[in-house]
Amino acid sequence: MEKASTEAMTLNVIAHIHTAFPTKFGIPRQSGLVDSLRGEIIFTPEYRNPDAVRGLEDFSHIWLVWQFSGAVRDTWSPTVRPPRLGGNTRMGVFATRSPFRPNPLGLSSVQLEKIEIRPEVGPVLIVRGADLMDGTPIYDIKPYIPYADCHPDASAGFTAQTRMHHLNVEWDPALWARVPEAEQEGLRGVLAHDPRPSYQHDPARVYGMEFAGLEVHFTVDGETLTVTDITRR
């Protein structure tokens, strides 16, 4: 009989990412869905040596290994309810990307726009398309290698039975003018991907989400999302 393994390892936080999302609500369900979303990865003091990112600028995309810091639990369940199945059907946790896992680790592929060297914090990675909350700890960064990482013929499991939900987004121009120009495209993309929980479909309900220092309120009726108010937090 094999002896049960007692091996464990300690992961060091090498960086944190800063994004437009101070809470989980509204974050795209996968990386790359909203490429216009901009984020900055700032290394912790121990890992700010520019030599550590030498050559990374030659890659267009990178992998991020990170912690579901907003969903850490002491226990785990072998099955979870994926939102894309309406929140009622259970699947094995390892057949999903649920944050409620034995080890709460996430994996995201993002576009590397550029690397800046800033005197106060060293190298900063400017990325696009991240699906991470502001302040999320990063444990590792690896280059995305197309010939090895891209699998066009891969089967999609239960996700092949569901469709990406896109909404028409409507707003009053006076409200939209309250959104900084640099954030408009990202916010529009987030809203178009329907940030509501998958089980909520009340057309009279007013939803609110925080985005880039703004409080954005909206309703959804059928395939149309209407922005009802935007205020500065």
Residue ranges and their predicted role:
Residues 1-105, 117-126, 130-233:
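Mixed-charge, low-complexity intrinsically disordered regions
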Residues 110-113:
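Conserved positions in beta-strands of structured domains
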